[in-house]
Swiss-Prot record:
This is Dermonecrotic toxin LapSicTox-alphaII1. Its cofactor is Mg(2+). Its main location: secreted. Dermonecrotic toxins cleave the phosphodiester linkage between the phosphate and headgroup of certain phospholipids (sphingolipid and lysolipid substrates), forming an alcohol (often choline) and a cyclic phosphate. This toxin acts on sphingomyelin (SM). It may also act on ceramide phosphoethanolamine (CPE), lysophosphatidylcholine (LPC) and lysophosphatidylethanolamine (LPE), but not on lysophosphatidylserine (LPS), and lysophosphatidylglycerol (LPG). It acts by transphosphatidylation, releasing exclusively cyclic phosphate products as second products. Gene3D superfamilies: Phosphatidylinositol (PI) phosphodiesterase. It catalyses: an N-(acyl)-sphingosylphosphocholine = an N-(acyl)-sphingosyl-1,3-cyclic phosphate + choline; an N-(acyl)-sphingosylphosphoethanolamine = an N-(acyl)-sphingosyl-1,3-cyclic phosphate + ethanolamine; a 1-acyl-sn-glycero-3-phosphocholine = a 1-acyl-sn-glycero-2,3-cyclic phosphate + choline; a 1-acyl-sn-glycero-3-phosphoethanolamine = a 1-acyl-sn-glycero-2,3-cyclic phosphate + ethanolamine. Disulfide bonds join 45-51, 47-191. It comes from Loxosceles apachea.
Length: 273
């Protein structure tokens, strides 16, 4: 998975897909009542990037729908996976459930079109930066189930993004009954280098049949860092430069070991190859 980083403006969707991304990540900000309001990162952010792009969440979700709705003029066949980087650290722990409810309501209305019409092809990863906000997952799932559309949860996965100890992450999932559809991230801003020790631990847990199905690292922009991540057998690399990763994947060491995920690949099934 080539995961385009910090795609917070609608026009950037086309830009990152054109560079080779089959997945994009964006930042979701909440107001004091736990309503998701807009996509926005703010400063500081990654080196050599503009931090200030934003869209209102309703507009952004509608744009995501257009890009993953077969038959729509903007449909992008190779755009498969969306990572919702939730900025919930501004919220109290007690607001996590409500944040999950309200996020689900927005996605259901604006991306899934209230469960009506032709289904969209995108998959979602709900990425949470605080282990204490595990109830956000519960609020999200219960809201979708209450709308009578359990099948939509087949297209939703989860991630805790704060580089916590892997056993602590697993315990958080146990508290809300999550046993699959788990992506595990590991990383830091591209301005700072980070080793792959924890990422390799997550890969071992994935391959050992644990709750983790996929592992991705962020934010990786240099050729050698991408090679190192691929050598660690991660499933995805989040980058500001998808085109560089496209080039690396064509190298002799990787062209037969990896292929780009397509829209017929389930991003929540552990790859066995």
């Amino acid at each position: 998975w080539i995961m385009g980083h910090m795609v917070n403006a609608i026009y950037q969707i086309q830009e990152f897909v054109s560079l080779g991304a089959n997945s994009i990540e964006f930042d979701i900000n909440f107001d004091t009542d736990a309503n998701p309001i807009y996509t926005y990162h703010g400063v500081p952010c990654d080196c050599f990037r503009s931090c200030l792009h934003y869209e209102y969440i309703s507009d952004f979700l509608k744009a995501l729908r257009e890009h993953t709705l077969p038959g729509n003029p903007k449909y992008k066949e190779n755009l498969v996976l969306f990572v919702f980087d939730l900025k919930t650290n501004s919220l109290y722990d007690s607001q996590a459930y409500t944040a999950g409810q309200k996020l689900a309501e927005n996605i259901f209305q604006y991306y899934w079109a209230n469960g009506e019409g032709m289904p969209v092809s995108g998959y979602l990863v709900i990425s949470i930066p605080n282990l204490q906000h595990y109830d956000l997952i519960k609020g999200f799932r219960e809201t979708i189930k209450a709308k009578g559309h359990n099948e939509l949860l087949d297209r939703v996965g989860y991630d805790f993004s704060a580089n916590d100890n892997i056993p602590d992450v697993e315990n958080a999932y146990k508290k809300v009954g999550v046993v699959n559809h788990v992506w595990q991230s590991d990383g830091i801003t591209n301005c700072i280098s980070r080793g792959l020790t924890r990422a390799k631990e997550a890969v071992s847990e994935r391959d050992g049949g644990g709750v983790i199905n996929k592992v991705y690292v962020w934010t990786i922009d240099k050729y050698q860092s991408m090679r190192d991540a691929l050598d660690a057998n991660v499933d995805g690399i989040m980058t500001n430069y998808p085109n560089i990763l496209v080039e690396v994947l064509k190298e002799d060491a990787y062209k037969d070991r990896f292929r780009l995920a397509k829209n017929y690949d389930d991003p929540f099934v552990t790859f066995e190859g």
